Amino acid sequence: MKVILLKDVKKLGKKDDVVNVSDGYARNFLFPRKLALEAKESNLNLLNNKKEAERKQKLAELEEAQKLAEELKNQELILKVKSGDNGKLFGSITGKDISDELKKKFKLDIDRRKINVENIRQLGVYDVEIKLYPEVSTKIKVKIEDI
């Protein structure tokens, strides 16, 4: 019997796979636990529609990330922080600081973990990489100034 897996099943397959199993295994184990559906024409159409919708959504997210990357490409953020002698900062600039500044200036909500910051402990201008999507990243200039 062919079934469509609704969840990952060990030693059988991943979610949305169409696999061949014995009738008893399907009726007595997979169906009662809602791990699979019978691979009828209507269920296969549902699966195909679902996969198509997911593909379109990923494509839309990718396009949006690329537009955002173009917008941010040549932008400069200015962070004003306290510093001591020789331009050394009290503490350091983190991804959270940059994320907060992006939220203030551009009204963008970018997760701090997606911002790749080297150790910024001095005043100056730094290139910071922002990963917007698995294949899309951009660099912005961050200027650190004394208050």
Swiss-Prot record:
Gene Ontology CC: one annotated term: ribosome
Record-level GO BP terms: translation
Keyword vocabulary terms for this entry: Ribonucleoprotein, Ribosomal protein, RNA-binding, rRNA-binding
Statement: the UniProt record of this protein carries the keyword Transport: no
GO molecular function per UniProt: rRNA binding; structural constituent of ribosome
InterPro entries (alphabetical): Ribosomal_bL9, Ribosomal_bL9/RNase_H1_N, Ribosomal_bL9_bac/chp, Ribosomal_bL9_C, Ribosomal_bL9_C_sf, Ribosomal_bL9_N, Ribosomal_bL9_N_sf
Entry superkingdom: Bacteria
Record-stated family: Belongs to the bacterial ribosomal protein bL9 family.
NCBIfam families: L9
Protein role: Binds to the 23S rRNA.
Name by which UniProt lists this protein: Large ribosomal subunit protein bL9
